[in-house]
């Protein structure tokens, strides 16, 4: 393969089709050998290591991705790297920091729904039920069929003693 982008895309292909003979990380790592700052490969490796429950390694890749993607602008076009980093932090039990990074992820349109859903769940964890409802509603504004956001909303409403029947009966 001639370019970093080709290696990255080959890794994405292997990951999508779950080829049992090849792991996608070999492509992403080769891309990073050629360009240590290749942001898509850094994010892909963070996701790969997260999926293997190697959270420390995933965290390192995500931090490198954030460092490179935010060189010129903290408000990045895609919130994916912030979202992935927040997931890793949450898995490591760093809930406050995860919350902050989910908030950063929610600034990008591609990540609002999923980031607000995770924020609502962390609100519930912190017994901040009114905030959880607000954040779940925002997530639902970006995807009415989001089952996890609906569940978070119902849990928060029940915790406040509110009737959650209308959300349960929505299609």
Predicted features and spans:
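Residue-level recognition of tetratricopeptide repeat
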Residues: 12-13, 47, 87, 121, ...
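Residue-level detector of the short coil/turn that links helix A to helix B
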Residues: 18-19, 53, 93, 127, ...
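Single-residue signature of alpha-solenoid repeat helices
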Residues: 24, 58, 98, 132, ...
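Structural marker of alpha-solenoid helical repeat scaffolds
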Residues: 34, 68-72, 108, 142
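TPR alpha-solenoid repeat register
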Residues: 41, 74-75, 81, 115, ...
